[in-house]
Each structure stands twice: as C-alpha cells, then as structure tokens.
C-alpha cells in the first residue's frame, strides 16, 4: 500500500443516512471511467437506483474534458496498446526475412492511418461503455460533478445549467491526470494524452521519466522509426521493479537503438527553428520534435468541493479512504486513481466491484492488494507478479532462493535478433512458497497472467516443478528451472539506489 488509510471496521451503512428521507438516487457516481462504470453496473445489478456523471468526450483531457470510459479506454491502456502493436510490426517485418519472406520494396509507415484506426476504436469503446450503463438502467449525465453536501451532487452541464441530485451514497471515481515538471519552457512539452493524438509523427523525441509510460512510449516511437532519447533520474528505469529485470529492460531498450540518459534531468526547453532545444542538468543539448513528460500522475480531486464538505485528502490531493473505500464522511466513498492506492485499471475494477458488494450486496468486502500482476508494454514487454528479489529479501526472515533462466527464444535463432528472454522466480527457502515471478520477453504479460493464479493460490516451487510444460514454448521455462541461481539471506534491507 502506497499510503496510510483511515482506520477500518465493519461499515455501518446506515451511518450518514437521514432516516425517512427519500433520495433521488441510492448511489450517485462522479466519474465514468473503469471504476465508475463498474461500480454503477454492479450496484444497479444489486437493485440500486444509480446516477453517474462524466465530462464531455475528447481524446485529450483537461479539467473540463473527459469521456465515458475514462483514461484507460480513451487516453491510456487501450490506445497505447494499439500503438505498441503498430510499433511491433517494424521489427517483425525485419525478422520475417530469415523466415522466407522477401520484402523487395520499401515498407512505409503511415502514422495518420494508425492514428485514425486508434481513434475509431476508442470511439467504438466509448459507445459500448455508454450502452453498458444504459442496459444496466444507470442514468448518465454529461457535465462536471461536484459534491454540494454529504448527500447531494451538483452537475454543471455544457450550457452552464446546474442540476442538483440527492443520493444516499456518493462515489468519487474521477481518476488522475498527467503531471508536468516545473522547468523553464515546460509549455513546449506534452503529456501522454497528447502523445496518443499527435497529428504529425515525431522523427526526434526526448522523453523525461523512467516509469512504465516513459519506457513504453520510447519503445513505441523507436519501433516506428523515431530517434529517441530517454532521460531519467535513477541509474535504471522502472524504479520499484526487480533490479535485475530493470537492467534487462534497459539493455533491451539500448539494443533497439534508444539512447538512455540515466541520473539526468531536464533543466530547460527552448523553441528554435530546428525544433525544441532540450538542455539537461548536465549541460547536454538535444534537439527534438517532441518532448514528452512522463513524470507521474496526480489525483483528479481539485474541483470536487472536498474541503467545503469536509472530505479528507492528502497533500497530493488523493482522497483518504478506509479498507472498504469509505471516506471520513460516511455517505461518501472513493475508488481508483483518485485514492492513489494502487493505480491500475484492474485494481480500480476490483475496488469498484467490492464497493458495490459492500454497500448494496450485503457482503462487506475489502480489496486484496497482494500478488497483483503488472505489465510494462515496452518491446519486448516486462511482466511481474508478487515480490521482487529486493522485496523478498527485506520481508522474509529466512533465506530467499533465486531461480533464473536466460535464453535465446526459438524465433530469434532463425531471425537473428540478438535479444535474450529472461525469467525469474523468487522462492522462500523455508516454506518453498513461490513469492514472485518476473519475465521480460515476447508474450510476457500473457504468460505471467497464468503464473499469477498459481502464486495467488500459494503454489510452491515443488508444485511448479511437478507441472508438465508446453513444448516448445518460453512459458515452460517457469516449470523447468531446477537449479537455484543464488541464495540470499533474508531479513535485511538490500543496498540499492538504482
């Protein structure tokens, strides 16, 4: 958990409710992203009368622009994955030559065509999400929602008309927004919102950040032929992931032609005739067509009227909730990125589902944040579940066993691509329980999703070893790693500043 929550207890659902009062809605939700839509549908299925509001649709968000489907569908996971697919074909076409495919003519990449296909898809999904709400009997309002009181929401429509609705429960699911660094010339840079909708393909890109968004866009643009410089403050990208796997990702990025600038920050951006001059804190100068800021996200909570109502939030603007997603105001709840617990779409879906189950389904249910799988859709991708080696060493009292496998995928032996797949298991030496798994290589997210089930169920290394593998496949390596790579003493904090 990234932040301290309110003390929890079995929620008293009558608390905060005015006895005998008739409300317009049992539940009113502010924000129709992944979490909001899931909470609306599930609550309605439990018999609740539900209203939900969302800002007008546009691919690029602002304080007054959003869209049903939220960040993931409109300007996040989905369009990004489409671009990752598009970028992957460049390497695939090159690799195809040794498999007998003769590419006699130049293969041109059409950015505008891909962009239009991406836009068509998010428009389609936006429509699907609206239909899901309608089919569930949820009333959708387009406009900006604010909390007027513990049981009242005000919705400002496009024409300025203000609508007011009472609700027994209010759920905040407004998500988060990309941050910008406070440096001279920052207005010349863009965030991931704009990066997904650029009218012209950037031939030269500078990316600030070492997180998954930065790494993914570096892979996307490089895969499409751009010159990419990735600037980040640590020694390795992807802080918080397993250090060994971070090094693998860094090696792969460099192997595909991305220029890495570790322990570096941006000092200034200057507009020139040739593009944008980027000056680093080391005095190095780079020229770019696009500068992408991938420096984190902040909760969308500023315009909700939280202070007036008395809803508690932290310095970053994240709404503080208990283990049932309830705020300090009994009738007001919050899920997803706006709470800054674990900012992933599947986590928001989990929180929303359990909120509905708690409030309207008669079963008080807490989200479980243990053993949640992650994926970084760089090329090739990284996927992990459970504890990293560093986390296991710090949290485990006894020794920790590390099993690794590094190999050249069968496909690469023919294509000639020099890029190893790396897989890793972290095991508690005393209990034999598999604490974590990592993989960097083709299809890693698809493979690790299956491994996540085993780890969630508490599988041991012996059970992994007794499982018959699928041959030939990369996945079978997870059940054939017999010899430990190293044994590490647990209960100590690893010395790492990577």
Swiss-Prot record:
Q: Where in the cell is it found?
A: Cytoplasm
Listed as disulfide-bonded, the cysteine pairs are 72-77
Record's GO cellular component, any one? cytosol
Any one Gene Ontology MF annotation carried by this entry is:
glutathione-disulfide reductase (NADPH) activity
Please give the chief subcellular localization of this protein. Answer: cytoplasm
Asked if the record carries the keyword tRNA-binding, the reply is no
What's the catalysed reaction?
2 glutathione + NADP(+) = glutathione disulfide + NADPH + H(+)
Cofactor field? FAD
In terms of superkingdom, the source organism counts as Eukaryota
* Keyword Repeat attached: no
Q: Where does NADP(+) bind?
A: 210, 213, 216, 233, 239, 296, 375
Q: Which UniProt keywords apply?
A: Cytoplasm, Disulfide bond, FAD, Flavoprotein, NADP, Oxidoreductase, Redox-active center
Q: Which residues form a coiled coil?
A: none
Q: State the Pfam families in the record.
A: Pyr_redox_2, Pyr_redox_dim
> Could you state one GO biological process linked to this protein?
cellular response to oxidative stress
Similarity comment: Belongs to the class-I pyridine nucleotide-disulfide oxidoreductase family.
Q: What does this protein do?
A: Catalyzes the reduction of glutathione disulfide (GSSG) to reduced glutathione (GSH). Constitutes the major mechanism to maintain a high GSH:GSSG ratio in the cytosol. May play a role in the restoration of the post-stress redox state of the cytosolic glutathione pool.
The further comment given in this record reads: The active site is a redox-active disulfide bond.
Assembly, per entry? Homodimer.
**What is the recorded name of this protein?**
Glutathione reductase, cytosolic
Q: Provide the species name.
A: Pisum sativum (Garden pea)
